[in-house]
Amino acid sequence: MRSLIYRQLLYNSYSVDLSDEITNIGAEKKENVTVQLGEFAQSQYAPVSWGSGETLSGNVEEQTLDGPYAPDSSNLPSNCWYLVNPSNDGVVFSVTDNSTFWMFTYLVLPNTAQTNVTVNVMNETVNISIDNSGSTYRFVDYIKTSSTQAYGSRNYLNTAHRLQAYRRDGDGNISNYWGADTQGDLRVGTYSNPVPNAVINLNADFYVIPDSQQETCTEYIRGGLPAMQTTTYVTPISYAIRSQRIARPNEDIIISKASLWKEVQYNRDIVIRFVFANNIIKAGGLGYKWSEISYKANNYQYTYMRDGVEVVAHTTVSVNGVSVYNYNTGPLPTDFMIRNYDVLKESSFVYVDYWDDSQAFRNMVYVRSLNAELNQVRCEGGHYSFALPVGSWPVMQGGSVILTFDGVTLSTQFTDYVSLNSLRFRFRCAVSEPSFRVTGTRISNLYGLPAANPMGDQQYYEAAGRFSLILLVPSNDDYQTPIANSVTVRQDLERQLDEMRREFNELSANIALSQLIDLALLPLDMFSMFSGIQSTVEAAKTFATSVMKKFRKSDLAKSVNSLTDAITDAAGSISRSSTLRSVNSAASVWTDISDIVDSTDNVVAATATAAAKKFRVKEFTTEFNGVSFDDISAAVVKTKMSKLNVVDEEILPQIITEASEKFIPNRAYRLIDGEKVYEVTTEGKYFAYLTETFEEVVFDAERFAELVTDSPVISAIIDFKTIKNLNDNYGITREQALNMLRSDPKVLRSFINQNNPIIKNRIEQLILQCRI
C-alpha cells in the first residue's frame, strides 16, 4: 500500500488550475512593465503626469550659519562647532567636570596693559592677570586640573574679528582655535581632558556649524562673519511671501497649488512602538521535543501625544534574514530537542510599518522627497522555560540586538479590518551583550536575539524620530484619495490556524487503533478524503483544489521535484492495481549514497541517515502491499478531519500540507536481502539482522549501498526493536515474522484485535507523532 492521497497531491499539484497560474503570471508581468518611473512613487495607483501648478519664481539664498543663538548653559551636543561672537570683554566660555578639569576663556580687548582682574566663573571668584598690547582681540584659555590649584593661562587666539569657536568630540575632549589669524599660524588645538557630560557655558551670542564644515568655520575665524546673515531674494517676488520659513517638527507646508491638486510637505515627529510575536510549536511524542520557535508578524495599536494632540498609531513588525538554529541531545524519545529556532543576527532586518490618524497618511498615494530619522532601539530577550514531563526544565535566556535605522519606504499595512498605506521603517540588527544560552545544554555564549521570548520584560519597544515627505493631494481638504486596496482583510487567519493546530493535535488521543488500520488500507483519494467535509461534490472538488495549491509548495513536493522527473512521474501515478513505472535513472539518483562505502561507524551512520531521509520519496516509486507511514499519516488526517468542529477552506489546506511534512518525523525503513534485513532510521540508527532468529549481524555498508538502488523500500511500521521484543516475550512464527517485516496490514490488525500491548504501544507512538 502507498497512500493514494499523497500520490495525487504530488501529481496534480503541478497542474492544478492552469488559469490561476496564467492570471498570476500576467499580474506579475503587468506590474513589472506598466510602472513608469516619474517624480512620484506610488503605493497602488499607476503614475499620472501632473503639472507643477503655481510655483514661486524667486531664487532664495539660504543663510550659511545656524543662529545667532542667545547665551546658553546646557549639555550641548558633541561634534558641532559653536562659534561665539562676544560684544564685551570678560569670560565667554567655561566648562568643568568638578573633578579633574576646569577651563574658561577670557576675552581681552586690544591695547590693554597688564593688570589683575577678578572674575566670577563656575561659582568661584578667581583673580587672573591679563595683558594685550596688540591691536587685535585676544581670547586666553585659563585651566586648572584640581580644585586646590590656581588657574594658569595655557593658550590664546589673536584675532581681528572677535570670533572664537569651540567643539566637544565624542570622547568629551574640548577643541578650539589657537595662534593668530594675522600671522598665518591659525590652528585647532585639543585639551585631552574629557568632559563628556559636563555643562558648557557660552556667555555670548553663538552660531552652530556642522563638524563637516570645519573649513568654513576656519574661514570665519580668519576673515569674519559674512556681511548679511538674513535671507536674500535674488529676483523680485511678491511681498506677501517675503518672509523666511523655518520648517517645524510638526507642520504642513503647501509647496504648490493648482485648482484641483496641490503639493504639501508634511513634517512629523513620531513615536514608533512595536511588539515582537512568535510561534512556539511543540512536536509530537512524549513532550521532550519542540519543532519550531519562530518570529511572526504582529500588529500593535497605541496612542501618544504630539504637540498637545493625541495621536492614534498602528504598527506592524516583521523580520527578515533570520538565522535558524537547531539543537538535539540524542535519538531517544526522552532526549530534549529543538528542531528549528529563529535568531536575529547581524544579517537580519526588522521592518516596522507605521500609520497614524494624522493628515499625512490620509492621501498617501503619490509621494516624493521621503526622508526620516530615528534613534536606535535596544532589544533584550527574556526567559523561556521548556516544560519537560520529567526532570529539570531547560531555560532559554538572554540575547540582545541593537536596531539601527536603515531606511524608509512606502508599504501597505493590514489590520483586522482595512489595509492602510503606511511607511515602512527598516532597521538593521547588530548583536550586543548579553549572549543567550539554554541552561542544562551545550547552547551557550551565542549572540543574537532568539524568538523564544524577544520582548523580555518590556511591554513594547520604542523608537522616536521624525519624517518628512511631499504628497500630491486634492486641493479640497475634505476629499480623500480613494485607495484601491482598502478592503476588509482577515488578519485572524493566523489565530484560527493556531487554534486548529491545537485541536488537530488534541484529537490524537481519540483515534481507535483498529479503525486507523482499516482506514489506512482504503484507497484514500482526494475525493474520498474531502467528501465528508461538505455535502456537495462541487464543494469537495473546490476543497481538493485549494489543498493542491498549498501542497505544491510543501517540502515533500520540492523533494520529489529535485530528485528526478522520473521519480515525480512515478509518484504521480494514481493507479493502485498495476505496477508503477520503474525509475530508469535510479542509480544516478542514489549515487551520492551508494558511493559511500567506508566501514567506519560514523560514515555508515551518515550514509544510513542520508538514505533514510530519501527513502520516503523512493517509496513512492515502488508498489508494495504493506502499510506505509504515509498510509497511517493520511488515515490520521482523515480521522481528525471528520472530528473537527469547524473547517475553513483557507485553513485546512495549510493543516494538510503541514501534516504531510511534520507527521511521524521519526521513521524507519528496511530493505530485505534474502534472509537478511537492513533497517535504517531518520535519527541515524542502523541495524542488520536475520529474518529467522532476529539475531543482529554486521551492517554491510557495501551491500546496503547496492540494495539502495535496486531493492524496494518498506516502511518499518513495526521496527526491529519492537519485533525483537515481541518475539522474545510472546514468540511469533516465521510466517508472522515475514509478514511483520513486510508491514502486512492483516497481521497488524490481528495483533491489535488481540490487544497485544507491544504492537498497540508501537502504533500509539506513531499516532502521537502525528502532530503539527
From Swiss-Prot:
It comes from the Viruses. Residues 247-478 are annotated as: Spike body and stalk (antigen domain). One of its GO terms (biological process) is virion attachment to host cell. Residues 509-772 are annotated as: Spike foot. A motif (YGL motif) lies at residues 447-449. Signal peptide: none annotated. The record marks 232-233, 242-243 as: Cleavage. InterPro entries: ConA-like_dom_sf, Rota_A_VP4, Rota_VP4_MID, Rota_VP4_MID_sf, VP4_concanavalin-like, VP4_helical. This is Outer capsid protein VP4. It comes from Rotavirus A (isolate RVA/Cow/United States/B223/1983/G10P8[11]).
